[in-house]
């Protein structure tokens, strides 16, 4: 979102890290915004019959303060992407490489010939050596990188540095911090089970996220991680963080077909989603996360 990035630049942030999709052109957009140049930012719209853009003009929000361009770290999963985007018009300043066990969303396993993703006996995606970045290749690129996914400890940091990384990205541990948005009673239950040595069963759910990407789910009794609880919950999309834009056709008052763009979410009420052109199979197992 250009408005969010521009606001962050006005606040003087030092670093922007991003990985949703492939944000290859963000460094260029930040440079253009610092120079007060207007931007046509392409928007991904499902079922689009034309190209869509968000027009952003920094002059509209200009302040007296000169803006500097933050450093940009691109979150990726593969050394192949690092090789590719190091040569980009305005390359990133570094990379964050996420392993398949990283929390939150994960890239799906790479499958030859676009075959369907294989699942293990528990229903989790099967990751192989193809899904891990080659550290020898990363070292050879002479670009700083950080590692993520199972590195959130003193030992993990040492392991990452031994692999040539500048440091690590940690996220899951902060979900248990005082400032996190997790419900306090759930947070305390997780902390308690970790302290007691029981640990938490974390499951890579291929269906939970409305985006369709695998998503890490902590299995806790009484939460939507349990199928029975999920089935009893009302479907809802009240925040819209993971909505997608979609082009739909409707009949206007004049009786003519028209096209418009709507926002939809595969975790919203099914009838609403279908009315916006969504497919029923995309709603199976989807949760508001």
Q: What are the roles of these predicted feature ranges?
A:
Residues 92, 97-144, 152-154, 162-289:
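Conserved active-site-proximal phosphate/metal-binding subdomains
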